[in-house]
Amino acid sequence: MAAKEIIFSDVARTKLTEGVNILANAVKVTLGPKGRNVVLERSFGAPVVTKDGVSVAKEIELADKLQNIGAQLVKEVASRTSDAAGDGTTTATVLAQAIVREGQKYVAAGLNPLDLKRGIDKAVAAAVDALKTISKPTTTSKEIAQVATISANGEESIGQRIAEAIDRVGKEGVITVEDGKSLADELDVVEGLQFDRGYLSPYFINNPDKQIAEIENPYILLHDKKISNIRDLLPVLEQVAKSGRPLLIIAEDVEGEALATLVVNNIRGILKTVAVKAPGFGDRRKALLEDIAILTGGQVVAEETGLALEKATLAELGQAKRIEVGKENTTVIDGAGDAKNIEARVKQIRVQIDEATSDYDREKLQERVAKLAGGVAVIKVGGATEIEVKEKKDRVDDALHATRAAVEEGIVPGGGVALIRVRQAIRELKGANADQDAGIKIVLRALEEPLRQIVTNAGEEASVVVAKVAEGSGNFGYNAQTGEYGDLVESGVLDPTKVTRTALQNAASVAGLLLTTDATVFEAPKDAAPATAPGGPGAGGPGFDF
């Protein structure tokens, strides 16, 4: 085990605070509509230009071990806030720095750090309650666009794209962000349920222009095993042929004689069919087949459900208004499933989301909810260069997360004003002793910091603006984009309540831990390697001229 060094009390806290300040100073230049970019070096490829706080924080590793520990603690604030709310990482970093800075003064003056932390926690709890009181739900597409625009650093086109995507797929729908292939941003919306499996034979194609198979008003057979023997399929094929409607077969695989017979019948016009593989693998495949069955009003023909393929009837088949099958994707549009059954299935999957332990499982379950409840929208981010697309894509991701947070917990006035307003609820607070009162004062001062930084980044005098905003009430605040005072909600400067709440709670949590630290243990630096390698001068080896 490597040797460790231990640093105590003020020396440790001073070094940790230096690390906090180095990271926070790099991150906070990005805050607000007039915040600046930060350029990040990459070990390979082009550098990255970003205005995303957590991206900047993640890149920072300091040479000094003690300073680096402080920086990593604040990095944790940004990461936690990003994970929980998807935005607000810079605000969280600024708040953490302010709490640490103010707290250090009191600790140096001899106040009890644990009582300071208790006072901080008490003030933050009161601030969170006050935030919930002034929060209002997002009800209109315009408000959603405004939240997204603010999070995307004032770019209205991004806000409009996200609002349009939510309009199209609903609040439950999946919205993904991809690199585009043109200069402009594009929005693609997939209606209905889509899964990533295409036709098993190109002979199923009946729309050569689009290179897809389209079938109207089809029956849908769902089977969890391979189909290779046509005799197993014949009974259900005969029933579908009599009905005069087409058939989509979704199974683990369709091969050999069965696939050949389907292709021949399709070409001759005897029975219009399309066969595709079932999506997913293992248990996930079973779950996805069940989702499709509920959406289309059918049943999965499987041993587990007591149904045999050779005994399947039209009653077990699902139905839909239209099916589109491409080379790689199948889309089921307007399935005939019962709305109550679909709703029950969505609730069931939501319970699984709450219980999921891995991000991957949670993401896949959320995709299933979206496919059942809404749809899928893809925002393709355009730009002239790869660097521009990457930077813009980060902002679209932030805006998307902020929008979801706003839908979840509502909105408050932006521009740091909500944090100024909740100070009123903290002023009346009293701690159990004078040290706890000092902890409450730390939070009172720290709550000004996001507004101060926004104003500083806009090139104005922070103290003057903070004083004027504090004199006002409600939504009155400073719009850094226009340089004017007014009603921020009316002018569209909004923040999601969840983002503001999460930023404050995480900042106070980590800053409080840092203030109560009295010893730091870290790995001792290794001794420098000898300057002369073996076999060099004086080692007794032969001499060489180079």
Curated annotation (Swiss-Prot):
GO cellular component terms listed in the entry, alphabetical order: cytoplasm
Species lineage: Bacteria, Pseudomonadati, Pseudomonadota, Betaproteobacteria, Burkholderiales
NCBIfam families in the cross-refs: GroEL, PRK00013.1, PRK12849.1, PRK12850.1, PRK12851.1
Residue intervals passing through the bilayer: none
Species this protein is from: Burkholderia ambifaria (strain ATCC BAA-244 / DSM 16087 / CCUG 44356 / LMG 19182 / AMMD) (Burkholderia cepacia (strain AMMD))
Binding site for ATP: T30, L31, G32, P33, K51, D87, G88, T89, T90, T91, G415, D495
Location of the region described as Disordered in the Swiss-Prot/TrEMBL record: 527-546
Family recorded in the similarity comment: Belongs to the chaperonin (HSP60) family.
Places the protein is found: Cytoplasm
Protein's name according to its UniProt entry: Chaperonin GroEL 2
One MF annotation (Gene Ontology) recorded for this entry: isomerase activity
Primary localization: cytoplasm
Function: Together with its co-chaperonin GroES, plays an essential role in assisting protein folding. The GroEL-GroES system forms a nano-cage that allows encapsulation of the non-native substrate proteins and provides a physical environment optimized to promote and accelerate protein folding.
Protein keywords: ATP-binding, Chaperone, Cytoplasm, Isomerase, Nucleotide-binding
Subunit composition and interactions: Forms a cylinder of 14 subunits composed of two heptameric rings stacked back-to-back. Interacts with the co-chaperonin GroES.
Residue spans of biased composition, Gly residues class: 535-546
